[in-house]
Amino acid sequence: MDPIRSFCGKLRSLASTLDCETARLQRALDGEESDFEDYPMRILYDLHSEVQTLKDDVNILLDKARLENQEGIDFIKATKVLMEKNSMDIMKIREYFQKYGYSPRVKKNSVHEQEAINSDPELSNCENFQKTDVKDDLSDPPVASSCISEKSPRSPQLSDFGLERYIVSQVLPNPPQAVNNYKEEPVIVTPPTKQSLVKVLKTPKCALKMDDFECVTPKLEHFGISEYTMCLNEDYTMGLKNARNNKSEEAIDTESRLNDNVFATPSPIIQQLEKSDAEYTNSPLVPTFCTPGLKIPSTKNSIALVSTNYPLSKTNSSSNDLEVEDRTSLVLNSDTCFENLTDPSSPTISSYENLLRTPTPPEVTKIPEDILQLLSKYNSNLATPIAIKAVPPSKRFLKHGQNIRDVSNKEN
């Protein structure tokens, strides 16, 4: 039963598929199927889009090629302009060099053409010259052929630029003879060759004269440095200070005999340092510090210093104007110190009035006439001033004390 059932199922499915296909074909024949029309249109559209993209790519490539072509054309034009400029510059340089005897280089093609043209008439002449002047050719190198210009290249000189005054004359041994010999040599015509040689003159030899340029050696000078002057114990300062007070040689010899205990020093220094210390080494005085009205006893004679009561100046009044009668020396003798070993007396103080001493005012006796005339213009009642009397310092001090007492009483 099973195989029959499966066979019937397959037949049924085949019949259904045949019915569907027949119905679809029928619709296609009748024009009712739309899928057959859309498919070719889609293909055509795809083809058009591909062609358009290809056209765009081709246009881009053409634009690039056109730009490259334009750049090439511009470059060619620029190179042509530069070539013209360079040709003009080369012509100017060639003309400038030709002024100094330089000949332009001949191209190889032109040389070969000239050789082919001029070979026939020159060969006969060259054979004759070769037979007669074989020895001369062996001794001297061949001269330049006719294809090269006769003018030899010449280096520019200062005279070409108008600088003749800067030319340095150089004297050479017999230079004109070499020039004359060069001019008198016969010109030998040789067959043209590719590498034509030019006879170059040798530079004349000049013997150097060193008589005027000999190096003079400096003379040796003695600076007074010896084993006696190289002493390091003395720096020569005292000797230089006392150089003006040198004595005669005899007196120096006598003093050197007396002073045998002096240490060994150089001879020029011994002559100046053997003198006594009291003559040249005077020590400075002791600084004195004075106060007005205070008497300080001296160390030698134990005598009190007397304070002077000189009136101070009108403009400058200071304590430094006091003068000291006795001054103590820096060096003290032992004998005098032992004798004056007694206690010094106490300092005596002067009167209290002298401590507060003030300068006396100037005595105005009379106003100058020119000042009085000026003052009288502004004040007609101005009378001549009366002379002012000087007041002693004691009275002035008493008046000042009375004024202070009056003020204190008023405050009380």
Swiss-Prot record:
The keyword Cell division applies. CDD domains: SKA3_N. GO terms for molecular function: microtubule binding. Transmembrane segments: none annotated. The keyword rRNA-binding does not apply. Residues 132-156 are annotated as: Disordered. GO terms for cellular component: centrosome; cytosol; kinetochore; meiotic spindle; mitotic spindle; outer kinetochore; SKA complex; spindle microtubule. It is found in: Cytoplasm, Cytoskeleton, Spindle; Chromosome, Centromere, Kinetochore. It comes from the Eukaryota. GO terms for biological process: attachment of mitotic spindle microtubules to kinetochore; cell division; chromosome segregation; establishment of meiotic spindle orientation; metaphase chromosome alignment; mitotic cell cycle; mitotic metaphase chromosome alignment; mitotic sister chromatid segregation. Disulfide bonds: none annotated. Residues 146-156 have a biased composition (Polar residues). The modification Phosphoserine is found at S34, S119, S139, S152, S155, S159, S267, S318. The modification Phosphothreonine is found at T265, T384. Keywords: Cell cycle, Cell division, Centromere, Chromosome, Cytoplasm, Cytoskeleton, Kinetochore, Microtubule, Mitosis, Phosphoprotein. Its main location: cytoplasm. Component of the SKA1 complex, a microtubule-binding subcomplex of the outer kinetochore that is essential for proper chromosome segregation. The SKA1 complex is a direct component of the kinetochore-microtubule interface and directly associates with microtubules as oligomeric assemblies. The complex facilitates the processive movement of microspheres along a microtubule in a depolymerization-coupled manner. In the complex, it mediates the microtubule-stimulated oligomerization. Component of the SKA1 complex, composed of SKA1, SKA2 and SKA3. The core SKA1 complex is composed of 2 SKA1-SKA2 heterodimers, each heterodimer interacting with a molecule of the SKA3 homodimer. The core SKA1 complex associates with microtubules and forms oligomeric assemblies. Interacts with SKA1; the interaction is direct. PANTHER family: SPINDLE AND KINETOCHORE-ASSOCIATED PROTEIN 3. Belongs to the SKA3 family. This is Spindle and kinetochore-associated protein 3. The gene is SKA3.
